[in-house]
């Protein structure tokens, strides 16, 4: 019998214990930061990103399925139709998981994988899909849903000589070339 990690409560079935051991082995072998979650059979894994600093993923081994959930971005301030259309189109190309929203309109990526399908390869693929879903479109989502706020922040920082480091990826879009001064 596979010994359970001491930081994750033991699920109730042999199949669930096997799946939890597989998930734990994959995240440990990959050197990913992880810890036990608040629920039985839950591991909370931090995936480092390039556009989004990090993505925190909840992996919960339940009686029949591995539940996967990760926050992507908060509810857009503007251009809701374009913002959500972009996500829905990405859903068509995304294997295993899908985007969804909560009652506040915040965007998550998630899904459920049957326990019998939980292998090292599948867990690795799921983590890759989560990372691509959260990190890949992050800058486009910011521009679609938060452009006005970003422009105000840029203009404010420029007018005061503040650092633009956190907005540097958007310089080509936000920098005013028309000679206009911030309001």
Which residue stretches match the model-derived regions?
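Charge-rich, low-complexity N-terminal segments
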Residues: 1-54
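Short, surface-exposed charged micro-motifs
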Residues: 33-35, 56-58, 98-100
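Hydrophobic-cavity lipid-handling domains and compact docking modules
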Residues: 41-77
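A short beta-strand-loop-alpha-helix capping motif that often carries His-Thr
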Residues: 44, 99-112, 151-156
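Short, internal acidic amphipathic alpha-helical interface segments
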Residues: 69-110
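A generic structural motif
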Residues: 72-76, 113-122
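A contiguous, mid-protein "functional segment" used to position or interact
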Residues: 117-157
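Short, highly charged C-terminal tails/helix-capping segments
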Residues: 142-183
């Amino acid at each position: 019998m596979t010994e359970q990690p001491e930081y994750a409560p033991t699920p109730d079935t042999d199949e669930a214990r096997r799946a939890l051991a597989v998930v734990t082995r994959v995240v440990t072998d990959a050197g990913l930061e992880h810890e036990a979650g608040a629920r039985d059979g839950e591991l909370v894994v931090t995936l480092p990103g390039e556009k989004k600093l990090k993505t925190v993923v909840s992996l919960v081994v339940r009686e029949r399925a591995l539940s996967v959930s990760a926050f992507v971005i908060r509810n857009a301030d503007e251009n809701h139709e374009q913002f959500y259309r972009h996500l829905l189109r990405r859903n068509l190309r995304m294997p295993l998981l899908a985007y969804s929203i909560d009652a506040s309109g915040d965007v998550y990526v998630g899904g459920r994988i049957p326990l019998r399908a939980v292998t090292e390869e599948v867990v690795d693929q799921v983590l890759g899909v989560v990372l691509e879903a959260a990190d890949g479109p992050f800058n486009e989502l910011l521009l679609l849903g938060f452009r006005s706020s970003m422009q105000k922040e840029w203009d404010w920082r420029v007018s005061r000589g503040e650092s633009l480091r956190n907005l540097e990826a958007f310089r080509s879009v936000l920098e005013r070339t028309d000679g206009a001064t911030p309001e």
